[in-house]
Amino acid sequence: GALAVLRKDFKSVPIDFELAEIVDTDWQNAYKEFVKPWSDRQLHWIPLWEGDNIETPYDAAVVYLDAGMAFGTGAHETTRLCASRLQDYRDAHADQLDTTEVIDAGCGSGVLALSASALGFKKILGFDFDPEAITVCHSNSAENAHLVKPEFVVADLEKGFAGGHQGDLVLANIQSDVLIPHCDPLVRGVKA
């Protein structure tokens, strides 16, 4: 069977082995043990299940988040870098928050789109090719009733910018192996 095939191709596979039953884990919830609150300046990300236990400053821009089965717990450095730059943009264009169009391409859990809303932006679009991610975005949006609701749609990088759709600020916290082949629609998606 399978062991014979492995031994043929991998001479160092041990002859002795042990069978063990693997306990099924609730992967949808197991990650929660590792997700911690995070803040940068005014912006605060709080795991939904920690909401009652975390105090924030009075003027904090708070986003409650449960990534579920979508990418985007807010723990990755690139997500935090995007959030920091989002705040820099907000600070530099504070008088234009009502009219600035923000696009979160590959929005995952919606953490950056919801952060844009928490920071005062009003016109926000998030899209992701994964329908489950968009379901999570809508759920997170509902949990943040204090925020202006971003629009979330299922679309890949080509369709997300189809029809000439552009933003003043485009966030694309996506791996480079996806970004590089799709750089043309991303560049066209930024207003000149």
What name fits each language-model region?
Residues G1-T56:
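N-terminal auxiliary segments of SAM/dcSAM-dependent transferases
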Residues S12-I15, D59, H146-P150:
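A short helix-to-beta-strand connector/capping loop
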Residues P57-A67:
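A short, charged helix-loop
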Residues M69, T73-E158:
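Conserved SAM/SAH cofactor-binding pocket of Class I
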Residues L169-P181:
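A short SAM/SAH-binding and catalytic strip from SAM-dependent methyltransferases
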Residues C183-K191:
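A short glycine-rich, Lys/Arg-flanked "PGG" loop and its adjoining helix->strand segment in the class I
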